[in-house]
Amino acid sequence: MSVVLQLTQLHQRFNDKTLKNTQKHPLMVHDEQWPSPCEIGNVDQQGNIQWQAVLQQPAGSLNDLAKALDVTFPSGLNALYGHMYGGNIQASIDGHQVELLQVWNSDDFDLLQQNITGHVLMKRKLKQPETVFIGLTAQDDLLVCVLLHSGEVCLEYVGKKTHHVLAANIEEFLQALEV
């Protein structure tokens, strides 16, 4: 199954579970200066807005960034960040609580590329295998990353090498996530 289909289904499962548990779509703190096409409804009394993932039109691409960094991104990374706008997805895998990072709007996509650039350059400076982060964990300094040379999705402490493989690739990672 493609990354696009896996991601679409993951967003749907996350939305369905949230609706079942809260009678609302997933919530995000509303920021008038940071609007998203995935926002639905009105801001609630706590300052939150409901959201539902929507297709990016046109689709985002990391190809120019890959060329600028002189790297090849693993298959599926473009789809993971360039297919949909949405909030982050809370899930678990292999006993770890993770937050899959997603793109909220076109400005967020630009910011993501800046963050990826900084991360790759940091890995080069440390002479470590290059990775791209795709998620967070309950531990502040533990990231979910994709190894560029293999495509494996791994856990990585900030500034350290990856130390635990979660999935062989992005597609298998998305399939294994439980919401």
Curated annotation (Swiss-Prot):
InterPro entries per UniProt: Syd, Syd_sf
Protein topology in the membrane: Peripheral membrane protein
Entry keyword set: Cell inner membrane, Cell membrane, Membrane
HAMAP family: Syd
Function as written in the Swiss-Prot or TrEMBL entry: Interacts with the SecY protein in vivo. May bind preferentially to an uncomplexed state of SecY, thus functioning either as a chelating agent for excess SecY in the cell or as a regulatory factor that negatively controls the translocase function.
Family affiliation: Belongs to the Syd family.
UniProt-recorded name of the protein: Protein Syd
